[in-house]
């Protein structure tokens, strides 16, 4: 196993911010948000640090999107092991020798209005992944259709890992149902209901009235699997 790349203190702080932002909102921060957090004069300074992290192999930068930052799987594993190291030391089996936990998740296809999203007839197939890939334990997968969340780094054909939830905080990326349509959007509560906000200026905000009978929050985005990983 390769040694973890040596990061400067600032690079480690930025990496920690990326991880915590993904856990909190389901998406990485923008360059502008990183610059604001650390008091940089411009987003260009944040970009320089991100390029350095990419050269060291801990993140991947995706072109054409302001949130195009992805943690490499080895980075996620390292973060996960660091968090669990204290627990692992309580057992006789060294943490490095413990087999990675596996999760088998159903992929939800088309959904019929009025029936539970995880009803058997909605399950297309299942995939198995290592648990460390996700910020929180997901309950199911949903295939992204379209480019409405492009600027959050979520592209057509990707799989979203979803944790069931009945509540969401403003700014979190959610999976919501409108009748027989399931959509991935950013959540914002307004005085008159819920706004489902795309991350692409070519798409309109969807406003859902507070008393809408056809609306349901199905869960929170807790992970992303690129469609290229499934080939």
UniProtKB/Swiss-Prot annotation:
Record site feature (Cleavage), residues: 113-114
Which top-level enzyme class is recorded in the Swiss-Prot or TrEMBL entry?
hydrolase
Query: Sorted alphabetically, which keywords does the UniProt record give?
Result: Autocatalytic cleavage, DNA damage, DNA repair, DNA replication, DNA-binding, Hydrolase, Repressor, SOS response, Transcription, Transcription regulation
User: Which Pfam family would be a valid example here?
Assistant: Peptidase_S24
* UniProt cross-references to InterPro entries, sorted A to Z: LexA (IPR006200), LexA-like (IPR039418), LexA/Signal_pep-like_sf (IPR036286), LexA_DNA-bd_dom (IPR006199), LexA_repressor (IPR050077), Peptidase_S24_LexA (IPR006197), Peptidase_S24_S26A/B/C (IPR015927), WH-like_DNA-bd_sf (IPR036388)
**DNA-binding region coordinates:** 31-51
Active-site feature positions:
148 (for autocatalytic cleavage activity), 185 (for autocatalytic cleavage activity)
Is Repeat one of the keywords UniProt gives this record?
no
The protein's Enzyme Commission number = 3.4.21.88
What GO molecular-function term can you cite, just one? DNA binding
List GO BP terms, alphabetically.
Answer: DNA repair; DNA replication; negative regulation of DNA-templated transcription; proteolysis; SOS response
> Membrane-spanning regions, if any?
none
Reaction(s) catalysed (UniProt annotation): Hydrolysis of Ala-|-Gly bond in repressor LexA
Going by the entry's taxonomy, the superkingdom of the source organism is recorded as Bacteria
Recorded family membership = Belongs to the peptidase S24 family.
Protein's job: Represses a number of genes involved in the response to DNA damage (SOS response), including recA and lexA. In the presence of single-stranded DNA, RecA interacts with LexA causing an autocatalytic cleavage which disrupts the DNA-binding part of LexA, leading to derepression of the SOS regulon and eventually DNA repair.
| Subunit record text | Homodimer.
What is the protein's name according to its record? LexA repressor
Gene responsible for this protein: lexA
């Amino acid at each position: 196993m390769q040694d973890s790349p040596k990061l400067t203190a600032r690079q480690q702080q930025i990496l920690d911010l990326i991880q915590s932002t993904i856990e909190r909102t389901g998406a990485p921060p923008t360059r502008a948000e990183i610059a604001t957090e650390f008091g940089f004069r411009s987003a260009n300074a944040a970009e320089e640090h991100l390029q350095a992290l990419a050269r060291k192999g801990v993140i991947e930068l995706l072109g054409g999107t302001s949130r195009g930052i992805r943690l490499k799987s080895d980075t996620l594993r390292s973060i996960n092991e660091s968090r669990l190291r204290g627990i692992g030391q309580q057992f006789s089996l060294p943490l490095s020798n413990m087999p990675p936990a596996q999760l088998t998740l159903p992929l939800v296809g088309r959904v019929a209005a009025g029936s539970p999203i995880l009803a058997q007839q909605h399950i297309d197939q299942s995939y198995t992944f290592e648990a460390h890939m996700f910020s929180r334990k997901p309950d199911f997968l949903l295939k992204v259709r379209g480019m409405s969340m492009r600027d959050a780094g979520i592209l057509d054909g990707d799989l979203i890992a979803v944790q069931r939830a009945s509540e969401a905080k403003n700014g979190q990326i959610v999976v919501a149902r409108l009748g027989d349509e399931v959509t991935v959007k950013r959540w914002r509560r307004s005085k008159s209901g819920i706004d489902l906000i795309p991350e692409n200026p070519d798409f309109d905000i969807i406003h859902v009235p507070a008393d809408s009978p056809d609306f349901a929050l199905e869960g929170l985005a807790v992970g992303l699997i690129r469609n290229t990983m499934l080939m």
